[in-house]
């Protein structure tokens, strides 16, 4: 299936309500539609079109870490994929802010907070923010 089943629509001048309704119906048949101002489309594309590559890098790095910690590669990849898929499903199904889920699974002095500290130390959050911003800026350049 599709990685992301949402489409963004920006309406140009001269598109009447009837035409908008027809287009909405067409896209609703294949997934959710979001109506955005045209100025926001580059950010939308950066997150939804480039985002899968960023998440794939995270999945690969997590699997590499598990291999370094002793798991066989095939198992590490399978577990990494399932962890990411399960996390995304949980965030979506329970409508959680990512920080809520992080706090739910992080115990004082435990393994998860040790890993979170390591990620904060190396700047993972900043790196991901910069990746999305860079992709949006490049999208604007290509327009």
Please tell me what each predicted stretch does:
Residues 6-44, 55-94, 138:
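Internal alpha-helical scaffold of NAD(P)-dependent oxidoreductase catalytic cores
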Residues 1-4:
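Short, small-residue-biased leader/transition segments that mark boundaries at the very start
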Residues 51:
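Aromatic-residue-lined binding/catalytic grooves and analogous aromatic/hydrophobic interfacial grooves
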Residues 81-143:
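NAD(P)-dependent Rossmann-like dehydrogenase/reductase catalytic/cofactor-binding core
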